[in-house]
């Protein structure tokens, strides 16, 4: 009767999906916590509302959202800090890497490691920022100029962005590639 136990058939699939959900939910919890701290718990704040809407769109449970807001309003835990790293990727593409962390040194080392693994490095502050403008409501970065990218460089860029987005500390990665 081996192979007839339903749990043995679904446990590996469930483990993979649960790990993926956990990673996504922890990113959203950090984002909501940071926005709630900026808004001082005001749920009417547009940036906090946007963060909550993003979390709800990813099916994050309401309990987790409430817990993240309460964590920000209380004194428990370290303060979350938003850091923006600048880099240049394959083909001269400018990268803006938005990280949210309670440990600046850890986040910097993780981003540096991922960039160096792919043959790139963090650029000086302001060296890539000129290529982007910040949207007033969503605080997302939009490229002011775009750079055409060759096919082989595009593959390297996609791999780099994927590796950065898989990092726990990194929230978003913006590029000015066409």
Residue ranges of model-derived segments:
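N-terminal cationic and glycine-rich segments that engage phosphates or anionic surfaces
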Residues: 1-144, 177-178
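Short, low-order "capping/linker" segments at domain edges
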Residues: 133-165
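Short acidic amphipathic segments
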Residues: 160-176
């Amino acid at each position: 009767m081996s192979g007839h136990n339903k749990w043995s058939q679904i446990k590996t699939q469930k483990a993979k999906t649960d790990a993926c959900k956990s990673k996504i939910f922890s990113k959203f919890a950090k984002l909501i916590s940071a926005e709630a701290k900026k808004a001082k718990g005001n749920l009417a704040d547009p940036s906090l509302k946007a963060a909550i809407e993003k979390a709800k769109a990813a099916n994050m449970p309401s309990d987790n959202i409430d817990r993240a807001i309460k964590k920000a309003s209380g004194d428990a835990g370290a303060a979350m800090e938003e850091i923006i790293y600048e880099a240049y990727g394959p083909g001269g593409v400018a990268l803006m890497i938005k990280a949210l962390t309670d440990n600046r040194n850890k986040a910097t080392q993780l981003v540096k490691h991922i960039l160096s693994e792919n043959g790139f490095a963090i650029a000086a502050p302001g060296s890539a920022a000129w290529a982007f403008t910040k949207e007033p409501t969503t605080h997302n970065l939009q490229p002011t100029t775009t750079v055409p990218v060759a096919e082989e460089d595009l593959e390297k860029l996609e791999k780099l962005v994927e590796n950065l987005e898989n990092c726990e500390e990194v929230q978003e990665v913006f590029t000015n590639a066409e």
